[in-house]
Regions:
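Single conserved hydrophobic/aromatic residue that forms the stacking wall/gate
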Residues: 159-168
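Cytosolic regulatory regions built on CNB/CRP/Popeye-like sensor folds
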Residues: 1-158
Length: 168
């Protein structure tokens, strides 16, 4: 399972821990343009992209879409601010192609944190890595349109070319 492999890059899980995590991952599929998260909604989940591509965005005062990030196959994703601060989301997260996801809800993660004390360290390290990637990406696209920012991203895709072919 790709999600377990990604976790094991930072936190080496034993067999019992692996089974615990697998038991709390919920399979979810999104069709192209489906929303994983809506603006002004409570975010109580963290996802992992087994297959597909997601985008987070919001609208400016003039109604223009502002892309904040792309989430690619093999990565965890969420609205970090909304999840960790228990605030309403300031972004939408939508599928750019059909996606296969695995999702943790907050209750499951609380159980995992209780059973695997090292999980808090994993979250900190992963959150720092994601935040740095997001900051670097945002620096590159701050003055770009949605189309230009997607072009920038598509030039450095690290996942299968099948997903890239599905994006129009």
């Amino acid at each position: 399972m790709k999600a377990i492999s990604e976790i094991n890059k930072i936190l080496k899980l034993n067999d019992d821990q692996t089974q615990l995590i697998k038991s709390h991952l919920i399979k979810n599929t999104l069709s192209k343009n489906d929303q994983f998260l809506r603006l002004d909604s409570r975010n109580d989940k963290i996802g992992f992209i087994d297959k597909g591509l997601l985008r987070s965005f919001s609208y400016d005062d003039a109604g223009n879409e502002i892309t904040h990030d792309f989430f690619q196959q093999g990565s965890f994703f969420t609205d970090l601010n909304s999840y960790f601060n228990c605030t309403l989301s300031k972004v939408f997260i939508e599928a750019l192609v059909d996606c296969d996801l695995y999702v943790f809800n907050r209750t499951s993660l609380d159980i995992i944190k209780k059973e695997i004390p090292e999980w808090a360290s994993f979250e900190q390290i992963y959150r720092a890595q994601i935040s740095m990637c997001l900051l670097n990406f945002q620096r590159k696209i701050i003055h770009s349109s949605s189309i230009d920012s997607f072009t920038l991203f598509s030039n450095c895709l690290l996942y299968t070319s099948d997903a890239a072919d599905e994006v129009d």
